[in-house]
Each structure stands twice: as structure tokens, then as C-alpha cells.
């Protein structure tokens, strides 16, 4: 379980990285921001580890899923590429949840799989700025979001 301070720190790091990825593309910024918010909130609901989660926050996520995300211009233009990443994120997250209490090897894999959401960042970077931008962002996420086992 992350602390409130850790969540604030992680949110700031993520926002700064998203700004670097998207430049002045407001739709791409909103897309990544929504995706992070959705996955964080759904993980909190699944784990039951955020007692401060409000009904309004849950409704916000429902609105994102049913209205705001599907009508986001960046997503609409690139959904053929992005949907496959959404499927991969979901699949990895489910596998991580299933194996997080398994043997030592399961726990190592779960530790890595749970952060699969960040793999969409280099894809968005590619769509906006090309392969060199993708490679740069790919390296940054591996450094920025690296955690000790068990964190």
C-alpha cells in the first residue's frame, strides 16, 4: 500500500513525464492523465487499500470510461494502436493480482507486470514524436518507475 505522500510524489513524477511525452498535444495529455487516474482508482478499489476513496471519485472514473476517454481526440485517432495496449495492460494487471501472493518467482513477475500501464507511454511518444522520442521515453520509464521488490 502506498502512502498519501508517495501517491503525491508519484503523481507529480508522472505528470512531468507526461508533459515531456506529449509536448503541446493537449488531447494526448488528457488521454494519458485519464488512463493513469483510471488505473490508479481501479487498483485502489480492487485492493481496498485507499480508505479515502470517495463515491465522487468512482463516478469520475465511470465518466472517463464511458464518455471522456472514448471521445478524446487523441484516442479516437489512434485507437487502433492504443486498444491493443489497453488489452495488454488489463491482462498483465490481472496476472499480477493473481500471482502477488504466490511463490518467490510469482511475486517477482507480479512486481513487474503490475506496472505494465507505463508501456503505453513510449507508444504515445512514438505516435507524437517518432522512434527516437519513443526510445528516450522508454528508457526514462524504466529508471523513473523502478521500485524495490515488495514496494
Segments from the language model and where they lie:
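All-alpha prenyltransferase/terpene-synthase fold signal
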Residues: 1-151
